Amino acid sequence: MLPPYFLFKEMTDTQYIGRFAPSPSGELHFGSLIAALGSYLQARARQGRWLVRIEDIDPPREVPGAAETILRQLEHYGLHWDGDVLWQSQRHDAYREALAWLHEQGLSYYCTCTRARIQSIGGIYDGHCRVLHHGPDNAAVRIRQQHPVTQFTDLLRGIIHADEKLAREDFIIHRRDGLFAYNLAVVVDDHFQGVTEIVRGADLIEPTVRQIPLYQLFGWKVPDYIHLPLALNPQGAKLSKQNHAPALPKGDPRPVLIAALQFLGQQAEAHWQDFSVEQILQSAVKNWMLTAVPESAIVNSTFSNASC
């Protein structure tokens, strides 16, 4: 039986619940807006709830004040969420409960292998510590893979096939430095919040291959997935904080929203100057067509650092 702290009490109805879950490693940029807007429109078009979660579980990567700035940016662009913001930094007890349960069930083990060793064997962990019975000192925790996912269905892209070696890897769920791994925290929180569909960027397809097995280990219903196209800079790299993509403009949000809608293949108001942010979004929800969203990544120089 799962610990009650992180067990989600199943909802009595089948309401759609989506979410946007940024990490506070910097301000939102155009690529972030694509993910936020796509998930928002999908939720609102389904008469569902749209939640926001701040994934602040990796302090070394976080920028002071970025979380608050992200929330202000969402509001400035008219993307208003339902309920309270969930902060992963306040969910450590739930992650500990999840780790303890997996350990008690024999579904995880301690690993002392270094990155250098794993790189030396090709970059995919080989299960070296599975039967060595290490203790917790100076060790990471790995899942004992029971349900390798070699393919899954994406509602935009169809069946996505995964690298079999990657799918079978015993991946880390608690880091050697004591931080909770992204994949564990995301699954525990998405289940806790009752998320029924995850709409996010295509750069997160690989983590999906790791997250679905965690749902299955916990005995939870797996949500649906949609992976949106990525915005690229002229050099072909994903717009990201690491690549110094500029923050979303602080002025009139409407032209940026129109550009984001067009990026997603959606009908956009031709005379947007005559409409408010709220009216633009209302129209976008009414006319939202997932089938019109392109699958491929798209170069967008307008909001990349090439235009700065």
Swiss-Prot record:
ATP binds at K241. GO terms for molecular function: ATP binding; glutamate-tRNA ligase activity; zinc ion binding. Keywords: Aminoacyl-tRNA synthetase, ATP-binding, Ligase, Metal-binding, Nucleotide-binding, Zinc. A motif ('KMSKS' region) lies at residues 238-242. Zn(2+) binds at C111, C113, Y125, C129. Its cofactor is Zn(2+). Binds 1 zinc ion per subunit. GO terms for cellular component: cytosol. One of its GO terms (biological process) is glutamyl-tRNA aminoacylation. It comes from the Bacteria. The keyword Secreted does not apply. A motif ('HIGH' region) lies at residues 22-32. Disulfide bonds: none annotated. L-glutamate binds at R19, F20, A21, P22, S23, E55, Y182, R200. The keyword Cell wall biogenesis/degradation does not apply. Its EC number is 6.1.1.-. Catalyzes the tRNA-independent activation of glutamate in presence of ATP and the subsequent transfer of glutamate onto a tRNA(Asp). Glutamate is transferred on the 2-amino-5-(4,5-dihydroxy-2-cyclopenten-1-yl) moiety of the queuosine in the wobble position of the QUC anticodon. PANTHER family: GLUTAMATE--TRNA LIGASE (PTHR43311), GLUTAMYL-Q TRNA(ASP) SYNTHETASE (PTHR43311:SF1). Belongs to the class-I aminoacyl-tRNA synthetase family. GluQ subfamily. This is Glutamyl-Q tRNA(Asp) synthetase.
